[in-house]
């Protein structure tokens, strides 16, 4: 990620209003229902809502983002909810998780077609879950579209193909009130 990207994200997150309520993404809430807490890695955690929500439910969270402003907001949110996720300032172009270390990897609103499959499969333990949701088909056609680069939007059925080495548990493409998405829950093969 370039320094311009880092500055852009810092500016965006510095201007964001602090979260009043702790609200995780619905896809994540559904995906982890009934899953016993373990170690989780959130990539591109932004303001930290998902990371903090997971920590309040007993998960041991490592949350990574390039933006110091986003991580500062995540730290404040965590303090308000009396949890301590480990917040890691890192560029995902260079970040390398320990192998076979996480029961769950979470990615929302982020897409790096080359790097993410490698990071996720490296990080997950056998049987571990990936929960990934990002902008999907139709996003660029929406009147409320804010994306500047269509390269950050999935093609139809692209997300399961990116993670071809994982077992698909559930995949869908959906039009939500504020965005179009591709959503995947996938499992690292057990052996």
Residue ranges of model-derived segments:
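Conserved class I S-adenosyl-L-methionine
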Residues: 1-35, 38-46
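Conserved SAM-binding motif I beta-strand of class I
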Residues: 60-65
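Conserved SAM/SAH-binding beta-strand->alpha-helix loop
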Residues: 67-69
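Conserved SAM-binding strand-loop segment of SAM-dependent methyltransferases
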Residues: 81-92
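A short acidic, Gly/Pro-enriched loop at the edge of an enzyme's catalytic core
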Residues: 97-104
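A short, conserved alpha-helix within the catalytic core of class I
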Residues: 111-123
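Conserved beta-strand signature within the Rossmann-like core of class I S-adenosyl-L-methionine
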Residues: 127-135
